[in-house]
Each structure stands twice: as C-alpha cells, then as structure tokens.
UniProtKB/Swiss-Prot annotation:
One MF annotation (Gene Ontology) recorded for this entry: nucleic acid binding
Domain of life: Bacteria
Organism for this UniProt entry: Shewanella halifaxensis (strain HAW-EB4)
Disulfide bonds: none
Similarity remark: Belongs to the UPF0102 family.
SUPFAM superfamilies tied to this protein: Restriction endonuclease-like
A Pfam short name: UPF0102
Record-given protein name: UPF0102 protein Shal_4069
HAMAP family membership: UPF0102
Amino acid sequence: MTADNPNQGQIAEHAARQYLQQRGLIFVEQNVRYRFGEIDIVMKDGSDWVFVEVKYRSASQYGGAVNSLSAAQAGRIRKAASHYIQLNRIDAICRFDVIAADPQGIQWIRDAF
C-alpha cells in the first residue's frame, strides 16, 4: 500500500476492502508480508483468488493513484502471491487487481497486471 502518510493508507485499505465486499468478493486476509514483498488484501471472487494492491494519492498530479504502480512493485507483489499460493496449497485461478483511491473516489482495476 502506498500513501502520502500511513494513516491515509490504512483508511484507503479499509475503504478498498469494504468496496470489494460490497461487490461480492469475500475477504480472506490483509497485509500479508514476506521479506521480498507484501500483499495488501487477499480476497476470493467465487472460486478465484484475488490479490489486491491498494494505491492512494491525495492529489492527481503525476498521474495519481492509477499510474503509481511500477513494474518493480508488480513483480514483488507477484512474487509474494506466488509464495502465498505455495504456502496455502492453492490450486485455483488467481488474478491481480488494483484499487486506486483518491479524494474523488475509488477505481477498481481488475486483472491489472
């Protein structure tokens, strides 16, 4: 989770979780950390596992939250998700979503990377 300050990040993650739950996803786990990466939120969408990266920006300059995920960050999230899948012996379809939040609202990007 990237934010202008940690408190805003926690608020954005909570809002993202509620947003996704209101749209039918089931919460599994939050803030899963490994030495090589972190998964902000783990959800289930039917039988599919969804690894969610939450991005928050207080302003839209420099592309805002939507454009703030780098290839390196996506790689770390993929690596963390792969480890999570192995540890939990998950044999199902998985996807990576991004929740981009700013003061104007939330944007859900399915299959973001």
